[in-house]
Amino acid sequence: MDELTRRRFLSVVPAAAFIPAGISASVHLPETPAPAAFPQQNVGRVREMVAVSHGNVARVKELVSASPALARAAWDWGYGDWETALGAASHVGNKEIAAVLLSAGAHPTIFSAAMLGQLEAVKAFVAAVPGIQQTRGPHGITLLDHARAGESVDVVKYLESAGGADVRYPNETLSEESVSGLLGTYAFGAGPTERLIVSRNNRGMLVVKRDGEPDRNLFHHGARLFNPSGAEAVRLQFEPAEGRATTLLVVDGPLQVRAER
C-alpha cells in the first residue's frame, strides 16, 4: 500500500477497527471508586497471589484469569524476604502452579528452572553468572532444595557436582535455658500491633513475628545474634548477653529498631 492509498484508507476506516478484540470502542462498565493505591494493584490481592501459589491451583487460576499481571506478583514477608508467586510454587515443587504462572507471563528464574528439571537452562545461568548457584531463594531456601522439591534428578546431580548450591545459614545450638530467656513479647511502639513476638513453632524452631503477621525463622550466629529467614544481611540482637533478654535490636542497614519488654 503506497502512502497516498494508506492515507485514504485511514480517512475512511473508523478508529474502532483498530481496538483490540474484546474491547468496545465505547466501553460501558459500572463505575467503581478508585482504590486508594490506584493504579497500583490491590495489596491484598498481591499478598494472596503469592500465598496461594504455594498450593491452591484453583485460586491461582482465578486470580490470573481476572488479572494476568498477578502472575508476576511479589511480596515481602518481612525484613526483605521477598517472594514471587513463581518463587512460592518453585520452592514447594508445585509444577502445575508454576506452569499456570509461566503461561500467564511470570518471569522464569534459575529457581523455577531447577524445580522444573530444565537442566540446560540451569547450566546456562551458571555459565553466564559463575557462582549464581550459591544464591538463596525465598526464605533462604537453597537452589539445590528447589531441584529436590521438583524431584529433578539430573539438576540435583549437576548442582551437587558444581558445588555451592546448598549452603545453609549458620545456626549455632542454643541451650533450653538460653532459648527460654529469649521468648516473649517486645514492644517497639504504642500501637496494638507494634510488638515483636519471639516463640517456638511446631517444629521447635525459634521464630519471630510482628503481631498479626507470619512467623519468621531465626538462625543463630552466636552470642544471641540472629538473622531472619530470607534476610541474611539483617541482624536481630538480644540483650543482655545472658539471662532473661529485655531488649531486641533489629538492624537492617540504616534502619535500627529497638524493642523492649
Where are each of the predicted segments found?
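N-terminal secretory signal peptides and thylakoid transit peptides that target proteins
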Residues: M1-A17
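Short domain-boundary/entry signatures in modular proteins, especially
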Residues: L102-S112, G164-E172
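Peripheral terminal and inter-domain segments
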Residues: A165-R261
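C-terminal segment of N-terminal export signals and the immediately downstream linker at the start
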Residues: I23-N56
